[in-house]
From Swiss-Prot:
Keyword Cytoplasm in record: no
Organism of provenance: Chlamydomonas reinhardtii
Protein's name in the database: Small ribosomal subunit protein uS9c
GO biological process, alphabetically ordered: translation
Coiled coil (UniProt feature): none
InterPro entries linked to this entry: Ribosomal_Su5_D2-typ_SF, Ribosomal_uS9, Ribosomal_uS9_CS, Ribsml_uS5_D2-typ_fold_subgr
Keyword Membrane (UniProt): no
Amino acid sequence: MAILAKAVGRRKEAVAQVQIKEGNGLFIINNKSAQEYLHNDFYSLLAVKAPFDVLSTSKKADMVSPDLSLTNLESTFTNLMQFSGGENAVKFDTIVKVKGGGLMGQTEAIRLGISRALCLLSTNTNPSANQNNLPNIYIPEGEGEALAIPNASDIRKQLKDKGYLTQDSRVKERRKYGLKKARKASQYHKR
């Protein structure tokens, strides 16, 4: 299977390398399924799948409703992890290698990497990944609908408006000599 798009996302100490390939709709993080790697954390799963949701043209109801019960939550998890669709749509495998940082830093690095890869996928000039050859893209919702790839500027604008292409440059401040931590000093004694 040919790699359609590659991108890198960073957040704090985490670095995520994202590859999008033709396949059968798998979402793999460090050789594990996304749900297993992210420990079934609902926020992390939503954040990782968010760039795909932006591409969805259908206006769906909010996934988190006030009457959210355990069964609704379980069905939402299964909907998040299913990549199913029509016969004429193209399925993509998303393969991520991530290291460094904690779970939330890795989640945000993966989200940035996926967003960048989707932008590259839409602007790719490779004949095997041309818009004419890949007419539809899978949305990771269990509804079974596929989305026609709009032009690159539309995808970029949608992702940029949601803030998924903006890299968060905040990192931990270095420790200074003479201090306990970056800014914490030992207790001051006047006498």
